[in-house]
């Protein structure tokens, strides 16, 4: 019996919608990364993008445990000398709540072209509205 290898053109990708309100950030991001990679499918192949599309709603209502709301710090660099910037979890949620989930999930995906293709299938929205109704997403309870 030969080993099965999924072909990119034959992979069936479904659309799912997830409500992030009240969910713990790390536990939610772990499951999202797993589904974006396609590890929940029987035809999972490491070098082929077999994952599904995922829409995340209510990103501003995601929860963190302990004192991370005030203690967790996100860093980025502008590229200029002395251009390191930082923001706490609270500031990120106030300014751009979608980025919190995007950063958490992106760090759990593979680095390189395949990981970037998986990351593009993640759609995160701060509120309850999204513009993917035409794809008829199924509700995914995590």
Curated annotation (Swiss-Prot):
GO biological process: negative regulation of translation; translation
Gene Ontology CC entries for this record: cytosolic large ribosomal subunit; ribosome
GO molecular function: mRNA binding; structural constituent of ribosome
Record carries keyword Ribosomal protein: yes
CDD domains: Ribosomal_L13
Claim: Cell inner membrane is one of the keywords in the record: no
Function: This protein is one of the early assembly proteins of the 50S ribosomal subunit, although it is not seen to bind rRNA by itself. It is important during the early stages of 50S assembly.
Assembly notes: Part of the 50S ribosomal subunit.
Family: Belongs to the universal ribosomal protein uL13 family.
The protein's name in its UniProt record: Large ribosomal subunit protein uL13
Natural source organism: Yersinia pestis
Lineage: Bacteria, Pseudomonadati, Pseudomonadota, Gammaproteobacteria, Enterobacterales
Name of the gene encoding the protein in the UniProt record: rplM
């Amino acid at each position: 019996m030969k080993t099965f290898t999924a072909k990119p053109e034959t992979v069936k990708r479904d659309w799912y919608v997830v409500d992030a309100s009240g969910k713990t950030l790390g536990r939610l991001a772990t499951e999202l990364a797993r589904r974006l990679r396609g590890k929940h499918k029987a035809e999972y192949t490491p070098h082929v993008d077999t994952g599904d599309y995922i829409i995340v709603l209510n990103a501003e209502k995601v929860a963190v445990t302990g004192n991370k709301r005030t203690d967790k710090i996100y860093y980025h660099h502008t590229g200029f000398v002395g251009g390191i910037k930082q923001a706490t979890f609270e500031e990120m949620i106030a300014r751009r709540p979608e980025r919190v989930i995007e950063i958490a999930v992106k760090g759990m995906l593979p680095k390189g072209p395949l990981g970037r293709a998986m990351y593009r299938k993640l759609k995160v929205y701060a509120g309850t509205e999204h513009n993917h109704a035409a794809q008829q997403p199924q509700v995914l309870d995590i």
